[in-house]
């Protein structure tokens, strides 16, 4: 990666819902078209919210839709970084 020039870097704050009840980190993934939830170990696949308020709404909707109060979901802040690079 010696021949790469960084042109632009951007960071965004996002929020995911996660739990470690199973003994390993799991993140909530929701299909937008349906009321269908699943858990994933891959944080890049997790559903991300643009604000903590929206993440709280997602958490409340999950509990209301599924009745699951034992997953112990928490809101996790996440910084996502992007770099635009030029290959020299």
Name each model-derived stretch.
Residues 10-42:
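Short aromatic-glycine-(Arg/Gly/Cys) micro-motifs in beta-strand/loop hairpins
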Residues 1-2, 10-11, 22, 52-53:
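Low-complexity, intrinsically disordered regions enriched in charged/polar residues
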Residues 1-6, 33-36, 60-66:
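Intrinsically disordered, low-complexity boundary segments flanking structured domains
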Residues 47-88:
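Short, mixed-charge low-complexity intrinsically disordered segments
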Residues 6-7, 25-28, 52-56:
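A short linear-motif detector with a strong N-terminal bias
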Residues 7-13, 74-76:
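Glycine-rich, flexible loop segments associated with nucleotide phosphate handling
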């Amino acid at each position: 990666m010696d021949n790469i020039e960084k042109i632009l870097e951007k960071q965004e704050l996002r929020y995911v819902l996660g739990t470690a009840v199973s003994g390993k980190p799991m993140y909530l993934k929701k299909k937008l078209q349906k009321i269908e939830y699943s858990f994933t170990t891959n944080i890049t696949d997790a559903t991300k919210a643009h604000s903590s308020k929206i993440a709280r709404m997602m958490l409340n909707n999950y509990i209301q839709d599924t009745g699951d109060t034992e997953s112990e979901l928490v809101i996790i802040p996440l910084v996502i970084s992007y770099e635009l690079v030029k290959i020299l």
